[in-house]
Amino acid sequence: MTHGTLWNKILLFALPLAASSILQQLFNSVDTAVVGRFASSQALAAVGSNGSLISLMINLFLGISLGANVVIAHYIGQKVEQNIQAAIHTAILVAIISGFFVMILGQFIARPVLLLMGTPEDVIGLAVLYLRIYLLGMPFIMLYDFGSSILRSTGDSRRPLYALTAAGIVNTILNLILVIIFQMSVAGVAIATVISNIVSSGVVIYILLHESEPIRLDLRKLRIVPRELSQLLRIGIPAGLQGTMFSIANVCIQSTINSFGSNAVAGSAAALNFEFFAYFMVNAFAQAAVTFTSQNFGAGEYQRCKKIFRITMIFSILSCGILSGIFVLGRGSFLRIYTTDPAVLEYAVQRLLIATTLELLTSSYEISAGAMRGLGHSLLPAIITFAGSCVLRLIWIATACRMVHEFWVLMIIYPISWVVTGIAMLTAYHFVCSLTYSRMKKSSSGI
């Protein structure tokens, strides 16, 4: 990562990562498609209404896993093996503890929060059932995410893809068996998801247990090292809060979607799958920006850090734009994978045309935020996200959506918030770069 041509290495890192995310969403889409086609619209809405809430509960800890990626990659750039080992074992133990915490907390808050979100009466029972079963797999989700972050910090984004592929195959087979044959509806989908998460985490942990030093995981060495925990949290908590802020805003948006009825909930859930697919291209190159910047910054290669930003931004915009265009142009065929109900399709098309069409705008803030985290600045991106996305979206819901209670009015807050957040994040990135590189030059020259 710290020597040679960058663009091909970034592609080799980002494409398997994007494939992992797309594959994961594809298998999640199987959940949606199976219940939508072989259960009922209510079952589809029950699965879809949980998406933003699940993200809210896990995003903080996913941010900490990103902190592990940054810290370990930085140590790899510095070639400090003892610190690499300490960070790895701290991260895995944090994953286990946080996974069980979210699992237990979720069992208690599932129904009250779904009711607070205004989940329709004809959906609430199925939605609670799905969420409670899904959360039983949370420790395994955390282990996979943290384990994958460790592997990616070394530049390895392929083996997490293999783990996810194995889990996805299991998930698909179990979905078909439990929903179509045993008629278990949302319970069957949730059980299949839990089992597939066990498979993916098992594969990643097996890889780490058999990895060469200093990346090898030794269960006897699992312990919290305060210094490494502090480093993980310094980067990870702001990153997690950024994701959590998005999720809070999206939970509020989901609550507003719920007010349009189960057809709107189901239609939004169907269209959201394609939104995710396009966004994952952006996220993959943002992850590349984090990892490559962190390693090169640790190695003192500051000019390469600037090149990394430019390359990841270009690739992100191009890949997301192409994928979004394909989905929008073929929207009729794609959306019918999930539902053939005309009332549901009407809402799905609205979301697809407004949000998915402009998904490439997310590159502006995701790549900038990733590059800043790679430089060790994680708090500023979180603050900008809070103001530009969370606060702005909540204001829009409280004002514009109340004045004009139309589905399309709710949807246009997505591109509006992306533009505002993007402008602020790009400005912050250039400020951070100027300040950081100036300090490094003075330090290296002994001033």
Task: Name each region found by the language model.
Residues 1-14, 72-137, 170, 181-237, ...:
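Short alpha-helical transmembrane segments in multi-pass integral membrane proteins
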Residues 26-45, 114-121, 177-186, 244-277, ...:
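Helix-terminus/linker motif at the lipid-water interface of multi-pass membrane proteins
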Residues 44-104, 141-160, 254, 267-325, ...:
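Small-residue-rich hydrophobic transmembrane alpha-helices
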